[in-house]
C-alpha cells in the first residue's frame, strides 16, 4: 500500500471512530483522551483481562510456539501490526519479529486450530484487528478465541481459531504503559 493510500485509510478509520463516539454522545474532544495511535501494544482478552503471550515467555520463541493467555505483563509479550493490504496485516511479536499464524498455515484453518508464532510471511497469516467489535479475525473468516471459550480462562490457556462469535472471544488492544488504555493499532 502506498503512503498516500495508508494515510487515507488511517484518516478514514479515525473519522469512523470519531463518528461512532459522536453518535453515542461522547464529545469529539474526549476521543483524543481515550484513543491513541501506538505501534507497540498488548492484546488483552476483554472478559478476563489476561494477555496474549508466546508460551514460555521467550523473547525469541521457536517457530510453532503456541500463543497462550496469561496475566503477566512484560516486554516479551508486546505486539505490532504490519498492514499488508488495507485492513489485513501481520500480527508481529515485537521482540522476535515472528508473526501469528494458524498452526500448519492453512488458508482456511478448521475450528480449534492453535495459534502459534512463526517466521514465515504469507497470505495465510493475515489478520484484521477489529477495533469496533473487539475481535481479531483471520483472512478466512474465523476469530481468535481462548481454547474452550471461557470468559475467565486460567493462565496458559491456548488460543485457537474458531468461527463462533460471543463475548468470550473479544480482545482489545491496549498500551504497554497503561493496560486499561485502548490504542489504535493501524498507524
Swiss-Prot record:
Signal sequence, renumbered to the chain: 1-37
Site features described as Removed, chain residue numbers: 38
Sites where the protein binds N-acetyl-alpha-D-galactosamine 1: 53-56, 72-76, 156
Disulfide bonds: none
Gene Ontology molecular function, alphabetical: galactose binding
GO biological process, one term: killing of cells of another organism
Residues found modified as N-acetylthreonine: 39
Origin: domain of life: Eukaryota
Biotechnology: This protein may have potential for the development of new diagnostic agents or treatments for cancer since Gb3 is a cell-surface marker expressed by several different cancer cell lines.
Keywords from the named record: Acetylation, Hemagglutinin, Lectin, Signal
Binding site for N-acetyl-alpha-D-galactosamine 3: 64, 101, 104, 120-122
Keyword Protein transport: no
UniProt tissue specificity: Highest expression in the posterior part of the mantle. Highly expressed in gills and to a lesser extent in mid mantle and anterior muscle. Lowest expression in digestive gland and posterior adductor muscle. Scarcely detectable in hemocytes.
Residues engaged in binding N-acetyl-alpha-D-galactosamine 2: 112, 145, 148, 164-166
Subunit: Homodimer.
Function: Alpha-D-galactose-binding lectin. Binds D-GalNAc, but not glucose or its derivatives. Has hemagglutinating activity towards rabbit erythrocytes. Agglutinates bacteria. Has bacteriostatic activity on both Gram-positive and Gram-negative bacteria including B.subtilis, S.aureus, E.coli and V.parahaemolyticus, respectively. Has a dose-dependent cytotoxic effect on the human globotriaosylceramide (Gb3)-expressing Epstein-Barr virus (EBV)-positive Burkitt's lymphoma (Raji) cell line.
Name used for this protein in its record: Alpha-D-galactose-binding lectin
Protein source organism: Mytilus galloprovincialis (Mediterranean mussel)
